Amino acid sequence: MAARLYCQLDPSRDVLCLRPVGAESRGRPLSGPLGTLSSPSPSAVPADHGAHLSLRGLPVCAFSSAGPCALRFTSARCMETTVNAHQILPKVLHKRTLGLPAMSTTDLEAYFKDCVFKDWEELGEEIRLKVFVLGGCRHKLVCAPAPCNFFTSA
């Protein structure tokens, strides 16, 4: 069973942040309140970042107060359909990097929740893992191959 998390975009960094859903929130729908983001800092990963908890190979920044800055997608089928085949996300991120009108932060957040994150959480597939980084991530991923930075906008 995959860890229950919710995601939120930090528009100041163009970074998708994941937050573990607390035990008291278990079972609530992902469309509920998302809370607020902490202000990012260069040393966002504390010494005790919780990597020992082993939540499906999340990046070590997953437990920082600023939230993780990389997401290890485990739904290769969904990513092939929505991203690789139609090239939706790379085009959107490229436009945002250039400062051109593109998908709004709210729409992009909904895209991850509805098209990607739901399958990742429910299916828990760990075959043909891919890493998609929005805004760049300086943290190593736990038990993951070298990240595919083709979405990096930094």
UniProtKB/Swiss-Prot annotation:
UniProt keyword annotations, A-Z: Activation of host NF-kappa-B by virus, Activator, Apoptosis, Host cytoplasm, Host G2/M cell cycle arrest by virus, Host mitochondrion, Host nucleus, Host-virus interaction, Modulation of host cell cycle by virus, Transcription, Transcription regulation
Phenotype upon changing E109A: In expression vector pCMVX
Record's comment on post-translational modification: A fraction may be phosphorylated in insect cells and HepG2 cells, a human hepatoblastoma cell line. Phosphorylated in vitro by host protein kinase C or mitogen-activated protein kinase. N-acetylated in insect cells.
A Gene Ontology BP annotation from the UniProt entry: symbiont-mediated arrest of host cell cycle during G2/M transition
Any matching Pfam family: X
A GO cellular component annotation in the UniProt record: host cell mitochondrion
Residue segments, region Mitochondrial targeting sequence: 68-117
Matching InterPro entries: Transactivation_prot_X
Annotated effect of mutating S12A: In expression vector pCMVX
Highest taxon, organism lineage: Viruses
Subcellular location per the Swiss-Prot or TrEMBL entry: Host cytoplasm; Host nucleus; Host mitochondrion
Role noted for this protein: Multifunctional protein that plays a role in silencing host antiviral defenses and promoting viral transcription. Does not seem to be essential for HBV infection. May be directly involved in development of cirrhosis and liver cancer (hepatocellular carcinoma). Most of cytosolic activities involve modulation of cytosolic calcium. The effect on apoptosis is controversial depending on the cell types in which the studies have been conducted. May induce apoptosis by localizing in mitochondria and causing loss of mitochondrial membrane potential.
Name the record gives this protein: Protein X
Taxonomic classification: Viruses, Riboviria, Pararnavirae, Artverviricota, Revtraviricetes
Gene: X
